[in-house]
A protein has these predicted regions:
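Short acidic, glycine/proline-rich loop/turn micro-motifs
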Residues: 8-12, 74-78, 127-133
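Surface-exposed short loop/turn segments
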Residues: 48-113
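Surface-exposed patches in mature extracellular/periplasmic domains of secreted proteins
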Residues: 43-52, 161-167
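Generic structural motif
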Residues: 1-3, 70, 96, 125
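Short, well-structured alpha-helical interface segments that form or flank functional binding sites
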Residues: 27, 31, 86-88, 140, ...
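A structural "domain/chain start" motif
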Residues: 1-35, 155-187
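C-terminal/domain-edge helix-coil "capping" segments
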Residues: 81, 95-187
C-alpha cells in the first residue's frame, strides 16, 4: 500500500548537506485511523480481497487517501531556524462495488470510478529551540502538519460538493452521470 509506505528521499546536493529520508507512512496510517474512527460510526481497512468480501454489504463508501506531494525545509536551506513540512493530500471516494479484488489478492479500482475526488493541504513548522536534533525537529513539524490535516479534513469533509451530494442522497453514491455533471460544474 503506497500510503502506508509513504516516504520521501532527498539526496544531498553538496558536501555540506546530508541525505534526508522522511518516512510518514506509519504515522499517516495511525493518525488517519484515529481521525476517521472519531468521525464515522465504523471504519474498516480494506487491504485485500478477503476483507472486501467480508464487508461487501456493510460499507457505505471507501476513502482512498494519497500523499500527492510532500515538501520540507530545514535551516540549512533557508537560513532561518525553523523546520517546515507541507503536505498535499488527494482523496477519492468510491462505492465498495467499484473496488475489485485481483487474483493475487490485491485491490484495484478503475481510475474514473470514484464519485468524489478532492485535494487538501496541510502545513507544520517548528522552531529549532529545545530540540535535540534535526530529525526530531522534522518529526515534530510532521506531527504539526498531521494535526493541521486532521482539522482541515474534519471541518471541510461535508463541504466537498460531491460528498455533500452523497450525504444528501442518503449515503448512496450518485449515478455516474450525475457525478460527471457535478464535476464539470465544479471545474
Amino acid at each position: 500500500d503506497e500510503f502506508a509506505q509513504h516516504e520521501i528521499f532527498d539526496e544531498a546536493a553538496g558536501r555540506a548537506e546530508s541525505d534526508w529520508l522522511v518516512k510518514t507512512g506509519d504515522a499517516q496510517v495511525e493518525f488517519w485511523n484515529t481521525l476517521l474512527n472519531g468521525m464515522f460510526q465504523e471504519v474498516v481497512q480494506i487491504k485485500d480481497s478477503q476483507t472486501l468480501e467480508a464487508y461487501k454489504n456493510t460499507v457505505d463508501a471507501v476513502i482512498i487517501p494519497a500523499v500527492a506531494d510532500l515538501q520540507y525545509t530545514i535551516p540549512l536551506h533557508t537560513n532561518i531556524k525553523i523546520y517546515e513540512i507541507w503536505m498535499k493530500y488527494r482523496f477519492k471516494m468510491v462505492s465498495l462495488e467499484d473496488v475489485h479484488g485481483n487474483e493475487n489478492g490485491d485491490l484495484s479500482i478503475k481510475p474514473d470510478q470514484y464519485f468524489a475526488d478532492w485535494t487538501m493541504t496541510a502545513y507544520g513548522k517548528t522552531p529549532t529551540a529545545f530540540l535535540q536534533s534535526d530529525e526530531e525537529a522534522v518529526n515534530l513539524a510532521a506531527v504539526v502538519a498531521l494535526r493541521d490535516a486532521g482539522a482541515n479534513f474534519a471541518t471541510s469533509f461535508s463541504r466537498v460538493p460531491d460528498i455533500a451530494a452523497w450525504m444528501a442522497e442518503g449515503l448512496q453514491p450518485p449515478p455516474a452521470e450525475a457525478t460527471d455533471i457535478q464535476r464539470l460544474e465544479n471545474d
